[in-house]
From Swiss-Prot:
A motif (NPA 1) lies at residues 345-347. Residues 1-208, 510-547 are annotated as: Disordered. Disruption phenotype: Leads to no variable phenotypes. Glycans are attached at N302, N314. This is Probable aquaporin-5. A motif (NPA 2) lies at residues 457-459. Residues 1-13 have a biased composition (Polar residues). Residues 1-269, 338-363, 422-428, 497-547 are cytoplasmic.
Length: 547
């Protein structure tokens, strides 16, 4: 019965039967197939026991064959399962050849003839060939290389579709937003400026310093900005820049206690003034107290420190007074020069102002502090020690007014020029400048105590006169003489600075950093610090020589 039903079909008419690579299962006595239809051999007891019922599903036996188009029966002696009309090779992609990179695309959902793929001679369900997930090719904006590049401007502005999609797919009218591509490597085509633009939060390279470490600046964070465009609060350092604040912000900060005070120049001048006041007081206190000790047996009528008033010439007394003045200045300058500069002398203050080492405001503050410090030291020495207060300065030794003025002027010029070369000019031995300054005052006192009292300091002579209430007729020489001496020292300092004295004996300190012949930056600093510009000397040979 089964042979009569299927005698016109052949197993070789199916694609699987025609495929030589198909390997049928070794066991031919399988009880079932994928479709649930049993395979029964011809002339077997199972085949004889099956009743002939046309309505039943046909039973395929191995002896039966499917009719081929040529009418020849199959001679296969193994069971061949039926396959769908669409080949397995047509529904999976094949790799490309070795000579080309073209890959066969995946099979479409429909067969070549447009008909739905059906399973022949099977009663089971067939899974749809429709893809259940979207692949990378199903999305539009995923890589810049998928679009027509801007270099091919005709295709780009024609809005031509991608070549790996069907002809109905078009690129969208807008490019992807830049934040989607900011962290992606730039593409290899000419669209890199379009899809990978610079980060607007970072200034361009031509507007910022590329290597701040070379200039000694600290590194800034990635997104550096101030708290606002008006205030001056630096996030990196956390310091308040008072000069960069607006008037409204300053008024708001004024409400906080001591905020404006701690960020103003007034506070700095106040601290310098207090330091100068205390330093002058301590310097003159020890100097006046030592002078009191030296003049214990002196004449108490004149109350001066000159050699003539202290009785007969006593070298030991002159040496004692000179030593106490020199050492007192050395110690107190060494202590207070970090606070106020350790000037302790109105003549030195005027000289520093003339060479622009200090400002006018600072000079006025220091001058007042020095005068007050001299008066306080005089009060303390007068009422602290039981001896007579003999520390005023007057002319002695037969010196006239003119002689007294020039003695004070020359001695003050020596002291001021020593301060210029040891303290103002920065060098390797700047930190021991107080030693040289104290020794300069010591040798000046060795000469001046006998004839003028060795003042060299208007504040030193003014304080005792105020406390004793007696101003001598020659008191003015202790103001004019030191002022002239300061002017002499300033003029000579300008002269050697204009001629670049550093080049006359380079390397005298043994410091290559301050040697202009070995350090170009020091050479430029010397040329920039000339007190008189070269243009003031005119032009021509003179200007070239001085420059």
């Amino acid at each position: 019965m089964s042979s009569s039903i299927l005698n016109n079909r052949s197993a070789r008419s199916t694609p699987a039967g025609a495929n030589p690579a198909f390997n049928p299962p070794a066991e031919a006595s399988s009880s079932s197939t994928q479709s649930g239809v049993p395979y029964i051999r011809e002339n077997s007891p199972e085949a004889e026991s099956i009743p002939s019922n046309p309505a039943m599903t046909p039973i395929i036996t191995h002896g039966d064959s499917l009719a081929s188009p040529g009418g020849r029966n199959s001679e296969a002696d193994t069971v061949v399962p039926l396959q769908p009309a669409v080949s397995q090779d047509a529904i999976r992609s094949r790799p490309g050849s070795r000579t080309g990179n073209f890959v066969t695309p995946k099979a479409a959902r429909f067969s070549q003839d447009g008909a739905e793929p059906i399973m022949q001679y099977s009663s089971g369900s067939v899974k749809s060939a429709r893809r259940r997930t979207r692949e990378r090719e199903d999305y539009d904006f995923d890589q810049a290389a998928d679009y027509a590049p801007m270099s091919e401007y005709e295709r780009y502005y024609r809005n031509e579709g991608r070549n790996d999609r069907d002809r109905y797919t078009r690129r969208g009218p807008y490019p992807p937003p830049t934040f989607m591509n900011r962290r992606r490597a730039p593409p290899l085509d000419s669209d890199e400026e379009f899809y990978s633009s610079d980060d607007p939060r970072i200034p361009p390279n031509d507007r910022r310093r590329m290597m701040d470490e070379e200039a000694g600046y600290p590194g800034r964070p990635h997104a550096f900005r101030r708290t606002s465009t008006l205030n001056g609060f630096n996030i990196t350092t956390g310091k308040l820049q008072w000069n960069e604040l607006s008037r409204q912000e300053k008024s708001e900060i004024m409400r906080l206690p001591l905020t404006q005070w701690m960020n103003s120049n007034f506070k700095n001048h106040f601290v310098a003034g207090v330091g100068e006041f205390i330093g002058t007081t301590m310097f003159l206190f020890f100097a006046f107290a030592g002078t009191e000790v030296a003049n214990i047996q002196a004449d108490t009528t004149n109350r001066t420190t000159t050699g003539e008033s202290t009785g007969s010439l006593n070298v030991s007394k002159l040496l004692y007074i000179s030593i106490i003045f020199g050492f007192s200045l050395m110690v107190n300058v060494w202590v207070f020069f970090r606070i106020s500069g350790g000037l302790f002398n109105p003549a030195v203050t005027m000289a520093m102002l003339m060479v622009k080492a200090i400002s006018v405001t600072r000079a006025i503050v220091l001058f007042l502090a020095q005068i007050l410090g001299s008066m306080l030291a005089s009060v303390v020495v007068r009422y602290l020690f039981p001896e007579t207060f003999n520390v005023r300065t007057t002319l002695g030794g037969g010196a006239s007014l003119v002689q007294g003025v020039f003695i004070e002027a020359l001695l003050t010029a020596e002291l001021v020029f020593t301060i210029f070369m040891l303290a103002k000019e920065k060098h390797r031995a700047t930190f021991i400048a107080p030693v040289g300054i104290g020794l300069a005052l010591f040798i000046a006192e060795m000469v001046g105590v006998q004839f003028t009292g060795g003042s060299l300091n208007p504040a030193r002579s003014f304080g005792p006169c105020v406390i004793t209430g007696s101003f001598d007729t020659e008191h003015w020489i202790y103001w004019v003489g030191p002022a002239i001496g300061s002017l002499i020292a300033v003029c000579f300092y300008w002269f050697i600075k204009t001629l670049e004295y550093e080049m006359a004996n380079p390397g005298a300190d043994g410091d290559d950093l301050n040697d202009p012949t070995k350090n170009p930056e020091k050479r430029a600093e010397i040329q920039a610090s000339k007190p008189v510009p070269t243009a003031a000397f005119g032009s021509g040979k003179t200007a070239s020589i001085l420059s």
